[in-house]
Amino acid sequence: IPLRLVGSEMCIRDRIRDYAEVEPELSPKEVEDIAEIFKTSLTGTFNWDYSVQDNRIAKLYELGKKLNWNVSMDIDWDRPLVVSEEIPVMFWDEYPPYKKLSDEKKREFLRHRGASQFSQFLHGEQGALLVASQLVSCAPTYQAKLYAASQAFDEARHVEAFTKYIQNRSKLMYPVGSGLKSLLDKILTDGRWDLKLI
């Protein structure tokens, strides 16, 4: 169950998106939180030499084209979601506040915990998509640019899959966590393209 923050920060509970509810009216602040702009000092490159300079990268690119998958067609979204009524054994089982919860509250806590984890995966995949897209312009060789573009496309599918799962299955989306946000900010705003490969 989401915890309230102290001070003037918005409560996490107020920032959880519940897809089971009717579309809410968004305030100007909420709209600003959704579309965030970041600036970077990246230097892009054109490479007019279209010869293959690294066969390993060329092979990765070809493999990526061959093994493509489609979120809409390759995942059975109509398959019923099986939700176990069993409460799994967890490391916090002996934590007194958790022990006091009813089974119904424990299941709700686990639902929110799972939704929070899936949300962080989604936000991380969007970060990976943005990093891969930056690499397309920054990579020094033609083949590296092609591979970075295929990687961006793959990350786009990850974003699509997690979004679809959250909106249609868990129906709860948590905001990006502060640790992940800090890491994404550092990577996306760094001007060194080779750092983004790590």
Describe the predicted segments one by one.
Residues 128-189:
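Long, hydrophobic, well-ordered secondary-structure blocks that form the structural core
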